[in-house]
Amino acid sequence: ITVVGQCIGAKDYEAVKKYTKKLMLITYGVVWAMTLLMLLFSKQILSFYSLSEETTTMTMEVFIVHGICAVIVWPLAFALPNALRAANDVRFTMIVSLLSMWIFRIGFSYVLAIYFNMGILGTWIAMCIDWFCRGACFVIRFARGKWKNISFIDN
């Protein structure tokens, strides 16, 4: 992300887009690889623990939900905002992250896990909803280019 900050300092916004896209592709590649390894070796990973059959089944469900969400939206929710922060768009990323966490991750966790009786799977689904909402906000912000006009020096 340092290179993105340098391009912003040089006001080379096409390079910012180019390097952000490149870094996002790398992030997607790493997330895909890590998720694939996690899913391929999930039984071996779980064998380190003395889990009941019910807990093992539940954990596998969580692995699958996490894996699907991670490969689709995790980079948008957690890597893309780094490019926005490099452009000094820190207030927006902080507000979106806090609101999304409190409304979607915590609020929906309660609703899905307790009210709809989904248990831990509901909590993980709520986390994926949080990632999706963050990612959508950050993609829209980056695409609109408002980050180009944020000053680095307060007057």
Can you say where each PLM-predicted feature lies in the sequence?
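Alpha-helical transmembrane segments of multipass membrane proteins
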Residues: 36, 79-83, 106, 110-111, ...
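Alpha-helical transmembrane segments of multi-pass membrane proteins
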Residues: 53-77, 99
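Hydrophobic transmembrane alpha-helical segments of multi-pass transport and channel proteins
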Residues: 24-36, 67-72, 102-107, 128-137
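Small-residue-rich hydrophobic transmembrane alpha-helices
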Residues: 1-42, 74-97
